[in-house]
C-alpha cells in the first residue's frame, strides 16, 4: 500500500512540474513593451508556434493604402459578436496606425472570449507590408 501511495505521489509531482514548465514557456513568449504592445520577439514566437491571425482595425482607406501581408480588415468600431467569425482557438494579433484603436479592439475581443494582443502601430511592426 505504501508503494502505491509513493508511486501516485511521484506521478503527481511529475505532472505538476510538467504543467509549470509549459506555463512558463507560454508566459515567456508573450512579452509586452512599456506601451503594452507585443514585443518583436513575442510576435516572432507566436508566428512560429501558434495558430494566429493578424487583424487590422483601421479604416478601409488606410488598409488599401498599406497593410501587413495576410492581415484581415475589421475596423475597430465594427467589432462585435455578429461581425467576428474567427475561431476562438486562434490568437489574434491586432494593429492599427498608432496602437490606440488596437487597444480598444483587443479589449472588445477579450470581452467576446478571444485571446488577443496589441501589436501597436503599423509603422513599428517589422512584418512585410503591401
What are these model-predicted stretches?
Residues 2-8, 16, 20-40, 52, ...:
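Rhodanese-like catalytic fold shared by cysteine-dependent sulfurtransferases
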Residues 43-50:
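A short acidic-Thr-Gly-centered motif at the start of a beta-strand
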Residues 54-56:
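Structural scaffold elements adjacent to functional motifs in cytosolic proteins
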Residues 95-96:
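Short, surface-exposed ligand- or partner-binding patches at beta-edge/loop junctions that are enriched
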Amino acid at each position: 500500500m505504501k508503494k502505491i501511495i509513493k508511486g501516485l505521489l511521484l506521478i503527481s509531482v511529475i505532472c505538476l512540474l510538467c504543467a509549470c514548465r509549459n506555463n512558463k514557456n507560454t508566459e515567456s513568449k508573450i512579452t509586452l513593451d512599456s506601451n503594452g504592445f507585443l514585443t518583436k520577439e513575442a510576435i516572432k514566437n507566436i508566428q512560429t508556434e501558434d495558430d494566429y491571425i493578424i487583424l487590422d482595425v483601421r479604416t478601409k482607406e488606410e488598409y488599401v493604402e498599406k497593410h501587413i501581408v495576410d492581415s484581415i480588415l475589421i475596423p475597430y468600431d465594427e467589432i462585435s459578436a455578429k461581425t467576428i467569425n474567427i475561431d476562438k482557438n486562434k490568437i489574434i494579433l491586432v494593429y492599427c496606425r498608432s496602437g490606440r484603436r488596437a487597444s480598444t479592439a483587443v479589449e472588445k475581443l477579450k470581452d467576446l472570449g478571444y485571446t488577443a494582443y496589441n501589436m501597436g502601430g503599423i509603422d513599428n511592426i517589422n512584418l512585410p507590408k503591401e
